[in-house]
Amino acid sequence: MEVFMVSFTLLLGESTFSLGEGFGINTNVFETNIINLSVVLGLVFTLGRNFLISLLDARKETILRNFREADQRAKDAEARLNLAKTELELAEKSAMEIKKQSVLSAELEKKNKNTKIEADTARFKQTQQETLTVQRQRAISKISKQVVNSAITQVKQKLKSSLDSRVQTVINNYKIHKFIEYKPPGN
């Protein structure tokens, strides 16, 4: 305590601080009353302590409030991060599903196109074959008609040149004889 008093005296010097006419603070430690000094120090410690405690409590509340707010913001940020991760996973799954569907659609479309091309090709070949068959039949029919007409013309010419009444009589007699000998089946 003596060290404190000596230090206090040296700091303040021997000056007197006066607040008014009848009241004053004597800064000389040796001239002051220990009771007055203890009262002043008690007031300083009591009031200062209460002020310091209230200041520290306010600071503590501010720090705790800031900590709770920061903790809440961290929880909110973590919740938003988890939500964003979930949405990202859903988006990735959706993208993969869309990709799969597009690949399957493309393959199905390709298969359908190939099937249609094969069917069109088969139909074209069948039509081509039918056309060739029809043209062949027409050609055969035309040639047959020409051959028949030519044969008929030749037969007519031969008949005109070789048919006379005597040959005609022989042919008629032969046909009559065949007709007479004819017996219907079942008789």
From Swiss-Prot:
The keyword Nucleus does not apply. InterPro entries: ATP_synth_b/b'su_bac/chlpt. Keywords: ATP synthesis, CF(0), Chloroplast, Hydrogen ion transport, Ion transport, Membrane, Plastid, Thylakoid, Transmembrane, Transmembrane helix, Transport. CDD domains: ATP-synt_Fo_b. GO terms for molecular function: proton-transporting ATP synthase activity, rotational mechanism. Signal peptide: none annotated. GO terms for cellular component: chloroplast thylakoid membrane; proton-transporting ATP synthase complex. It is a single-pass membrane protein. The chain crosses the membrane at residues 34-56. It is found in: Plastid, Chloroplast thylakoid membrane. In plastids the F-type ATPase is also known as CF(1)CF(0). F-type ATPases have 2 components, F(1) - the catalytic core - and F(0) - the membrane proton channel. F(1) has five subunits: alpha(3), beta(3), gamma(1), delta(1), epsilon(1). F(0) has four main subunits: a(1), b(1), b'(1) and c(10-14). The alpha and beta chains form an alternating ring which encloses part of the gamma chain. F(1) is attached to F(0) by a central stalk formed by the gamma and epsilon chains, while a peripheral stalk is formed by the delta, b and b' chains. Belongs to the ATPase B chain family. F(1)F(0) ATP synthase produces ATP from ADP in the presence of a proton or sodium gradient. F-type ATPases consist of two structural domains, F(1) containing the extramembraneous catalytic core and F(0) containing the membrane proton channel, linked together by a central stalk and a peripheral stalk. During catalysis, ATP synthesis in the catalytic domain of F(1) is coupled via a rotary mechanism of the central stalk subunits to proton translocation. This is ATP synthase subunit b, chloroplastic. It comes from Pleurastrum terricola. The gene is atpF.
